[in-house]
Amino acid sequence: MMRFLLALALTSVATTAQRPAGDAALARGDTSAAITAYERATDDAQAQTLAGRLLLTRHIAGMVRSDALSRSRAAFERATELAPDSAAGWLGLAETHRAAGDILSRIQVGRLLDRAWEVAQSNPGTVGADVAYQAARYRWERYEGRANRYLFNLDARTLSPEVLLGDWREVQDFFARQVRRDPGNPGSEDLDAAEDRLRSALRLNPVHLPTAGLLTVLLGERGRWEEALELTQQLVRQAPDSGGAWALRGLALSRTSRTGAAQQALDRALSLLPPDDAATLRSLQPVLRPRDEARWGSLTPAARTELERLYWAAAQPLYLDSINHIRVEHLARAVYVDHRWRDPLRNMSGRDTERGRVYMRYGPPDTWASFEGGRLSELDPDAADPVLDAAAMLETQRTPVVWLYERSELRFLFSLNAQFARDNFGSNFREVYRRSQDIFPARYDNLSLVADMDTVLVQLAQFRGARPGTSDLGVFAFMPLGRMARGAEAGPLPLRTGAILKDAQFNDVHRSVDTSSVLPNNPQQVEMRTWRFNLPAGQYFMRVEATLGGVDRHARSSSLLAMRSYPFDSLRMSDVLVADAAAPRDSSYLSWRDFFIQPSAGRFAPGDPVALLWETYGLQPDSTGAVRYTIELTFTVREVERRGFAARILGGIGDAVGLSARGDEQVALQYERSAQHAERQVDWLSVGLDDATEGLYTIAVTVTDRVSGRTTTQLRSVRVTRGELVR
């Protein structure tokens, strides 16, 4: 008996001595030696907990048989035997069950987390907060599988992926006729429990970021973003130097339409986060086309930063506004998905989940529908196999989740594992997503500024500048004031208009902004604005914008612009300026600036005259000092089939010598001109397209120098329509 007691005592001393050895090994970075030492301390609960925690980090998610996971579970089981009042031991044991690949292990997670929470009640601080957070996350994941539940009507039994892959009208019909929203609000009890645990966690640790993040998302899910805003305000007060806290603040501000403040908060977050975390948050990779993702990975950090700057400069909805609403939305989505769908156990961010990827690109869906597990045909072909045992049957009862986007007609199908909100694309929707990335790399339709943005019709025309090496740019813009002012009360409204030119690096070259007061009086009212710029040859980005105060409506036009040079030793033409009317101010006109021009947006009603004006440079004089050249105008129908239309010259020239039809869809006019030699030759005329049907027409103006034999051509498109001429 004495020998047995002595041996037992010696064993206890030996195992207890292993923890300091494990601590020393861990301090020098030798985790293998630390695990071995901790596992040998079989009578030390703390050592067993440390062993379980280290082993759990070595588990590879998705492995069916994992030695690391088995040993981790054994260590945590021993820790709970030795110290049943240890919350850390029970929490670790719950995590090993959650990581398991079988449903029977995972359905025990709730019970183990409840036990961990019971013993953590008297243990304030980080451990108690971690336990409460994990318990809340478990409840949240249960809710994820039951949120937005739809019920099948009596005559419908399954949701076929073929329905979702069909015509958009079939998808709409399915949701209108075959299913209905569950009025019982399933999952609300899990949501209540999750909120209760999260608030308990914050009482234990007010700056526990995972808890604050999930609670922010949860409050948003319940339409309580103002409460979330108050929560994040308290968070940044208590942790003013936390980038994660400011990121959550930015999310809540953006979702309560405080976009300017959200931009400031998110920029503050990026300045405070560790460099790697900041780079991940602002990364463009989640919104790139697949072919561009590899190139992104090969860029240096400096090159990525510059590309991000250029990307967001191009994406900014309005240059008249200092707030980049799309960039704010991108960052807010990144914060949202990371807290909603993150998987701490698998060390997976929310952006790496299937739903997270879709959300990053396309934002919140217009329809979010989940269906009862096992009701999705062709996703679970073995679900009805009678030889499957109960656990395997449960494993196949995945939850189908459908997301629909109205404006883009995108649709996605996900499949969620039972008792565990790990999602995958259902059926062949991974391929659907891949194709969608090429068509729509990213969309921001959830922003009213983007979704309701109207169009400014703009005509740009280039002419040779007065200074060598420069060109004049005429900008003729048509603001759809009537549409922008729809629903506005009577009275003057403030209108801001602007033409902004940027260089290839998106730095301002010219910015011309005008503020006025307008009185809308009909739905088709148009405000015209004209700008003229003198620019050297090069690549530019042109934006014309209009914002109407009082109703918060906006319109814009964006153009990539290649300013040409006009050498003096060759035959060249300016752009062809299309107008409703054009006439010289007097008989001594020398350039396009000497004309009265009533510009057009390129839209004409059937039978309306089309005025054309252009300049020709480099005509060669003959021995008498005169220039002689031929002008040919060709009108071609591009979008409709038109049989036998005719054109006639209304004014501007008196020496037309030819008119010919070329097939059923083209008509040509030809005439000759002669004049005294000048640096530039201005030509103008008005043409009526008799009986022209509605459609898109291309006008080709060709000038042939009869002295040198050289030829030059410019094209312009016009649309003939009976609809609103501003559209």
Regions found by a protein language model. Name each.
Residues 15-60, 66-70:
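N-terminal leader/linker segments that initiate helical-solenoid repeat arrays
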Residues 142, 212, 220-225, 243-488, ...:
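Residues within mature, well-folded domains
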Residues 38, 69, 76, 113, ...:
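Hydrophobic/aromatic packing residues within the alpha-helices of TPR/SEL1-like helical repeat arrays
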Residues 149-153, 160-179, 186, 425-727:
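Intrinsically disordered, low-complexity terminal regions enriched in Ser/Thr/Pro/Gly
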Residues 28, 58, 66, 100-103, ...:
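Structural motif corresponding to the intra-repeat A-B loop/turn of tetratricopeptide repeats
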Residues 44, 82, 119-123, 204, ...:
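Structural marker of alpha-solenoid helical repeat scaffolds
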Residues 43-60, 85-101, 122-182, 205-217, ...:
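Amphipathic alpha-helical repeat scaffolds of TPR domains
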